[in-house]
Amino acid sequence: MSAISRDEVAHLARLARLALTDAELDGYAGQLDAILGHVSQISAVSTDELDEVDATSSPLDAVNVTRPDVIAECLTPEEALAAAPRVAEGRFAVPQILGEEE
C-alpha cells in the first residue's frame, strides 16, 4: 500500500497553491511514496553504536588560514574617487533609492 495517496498530493498542492494536472498528481504520488520509503529505511537503521562515537562538527582538522596583517600603501581619497561617475562632497554620489514616492 502506498504511504501517500493521490488525494493527499492534491491536498498538499492546494495548500502550496500549485495547479497540478492529473498526470502530475499521479507522478508526484509515486515519487513521494518512493521518498517516504527511503526515509523509512533510513529511520530503521540502528543507532545504538553511535553512542560510542564522539560528536564532531567537522571530520577535518581544518584551521583558519590567514595572512599577516601588514600595513601597506592604499589609495588616497582623490585616487579612489577619480574614476567615479559622480562625486559629491568628497564621496561617491549615487541615485537615492529610499524615501522616494512610488
Curated annotation (Swiss-Prot):
PANTHER family: GLUTAMYL-TRNA(GLN) AMIDOTRANSFERASE SUBUNIT C, MITOCHONDRIAL. This is Aspartyl/glutamyl-tRNA(Asn/Gln) amidotransferase subunit C. SUPFAM superfamilies: Glu-tRNAGln amidotransferase C subunit. Heterotrimer of A, B and C subunits. It catalyses: L-glutamyl-tRNA(Gln) + L-glutamine + ATP + H2O = L-glutaminyl-tRNA(Gln) + L-glutamate + ADP + phosphate + H(+); L-aspartyl-tRNA(Asn) + L-glutamine + ATP + H2O = L-asparaginyl-tRNA(Asn) + L-glutamate + ADP + phosphate + 2 H(+). It is an enzyme of class 6 (ligase). HAMAP family: GatC (MF_00122). One of its GO terms (molecular function) is glutaminyl-tRNA synthase (glutamine-hydrolyzing) activity. Keywords: ATP-binding, Ligase, Nucleotide-binding, Protein biosynthesis. It comes from the Bacteria. NCBIfam families: gatC. One of its GO terms (biological process) is translation. Its EC number is 6.3.5.-. Belongs to the GatC family. Pfam families: GatC. Allows the formation of correctly charged Asn-tRNA(Asn) or Gln-tRNA(Gln) through the transamidation of misacylated Asp-tRNA(Asn) or Glu-tRNA(Gln) in organisms which lack either or both of asparaginyl-tRNA or glutaminyl-tRNA synthetases. The reaction takes place in the presence of glutamine and ATP through an activated phospho-Asp-tRNA(Asn) or phospho-Glu-tRNA(Gln). The gene is gatC. Coiled coil: none annotated.
